[in-house]
Amino acid sequence: MQIQDSTQIQDPIEVAAAVKDMNVIFVQDVSGSMMDERRSVANGINEIVGDVKKRYKAPCEHKATVCIIQFSSHDCIRVGTAMPVHDVPVMRETDLVCDGMTALWDAVAIAIERMNSNSAGVPATTYIFTDGDNNDSRKYTQSSVNEMIADNKKRNPMHSILFIGSDPSAKRNAEGMGLDRMHSIQHGSDNTPVAYEVCRRALGRCVSGDTQSTEFNHDDIVMSETPYHEPHTPCAPHTPLPHHTDSQMSDDDYAFASDDVPSIVHRTS
C-alpha cells in the first residue's frame, strides 16, 4: 500500500506562516490492537508534519522540531530523535510495528520528561494517541503522571498536552491526568483520520498566532466525535450479460471484476 507523501504535495491553499517556535512530540500507541490503523496513523502524522513544514518554510525565521515516540509494552517504548521539521522523513506503514500491550503511563511520563528537558522556554505540543487503556506500565501510574502534568503547567505555561483516544476509557484517562475538555477528545474507531485532522488544525491555529497554546475548540470536538462515513459512490445500473454457450465466449467475457480495481503499489523502505 502506497502511503501518500503529504509532506511533498503542493497544496494550492496557502497557510498562515508561523509566528513562534514550536517543538512537537507525537506519543503514538503501536500496541497489537493498532495493526489495522497503521495506514490512518501514518497518513495522519504525515498530514500534521506536512502542514508544519509549510508554515515554517522560508522566509519564516522561526523553527520547529518533531520527535516521535512509539510505545506498546513497558519494554517497547521507542523514543525517536528530535529533529528539525524539514528533516522529518515521510512515515510509512512499515515504520509502525504494532505488537504487545499498552504502557500508557510510562510513555506519557517519558514524553513529559523529554518536553521539559528539550523545550524549556519554548512552546511545545505533545499529542498522545491511543486506542486502549493502560495495561502494562511498570514505572509510572496515572497519579504520578497527573502530578507531572500539573508541575509542567506551572513551570511551562507554553506547553500543551493533548490526549486523543478511541477507547471508552479515553475521557476518564484524560480527566485522571488533569486534562480538560479542550485538551482531549474521544473519537470513534472509524474516526481515526478525522482525529488527526483536528489535531492538525489545532496546531496550525497555535503556531500562526490565533491561539496562545494548542487546544481543541468546540468544532474540533464535534467533528471528531461525529460518526464518519465513507463517501458513497452510486453504482452503475446492472446490465445483464448476453447468454453465450462456452463455444461463443470471447476472451473479454472472462474478464474479472477485479480488473477495475487499481493495482496495489508496494513501497520499499
What are these regions (language model features)?
Residues 1-269:
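Acidic, low-complexity intrinsically disordered regions
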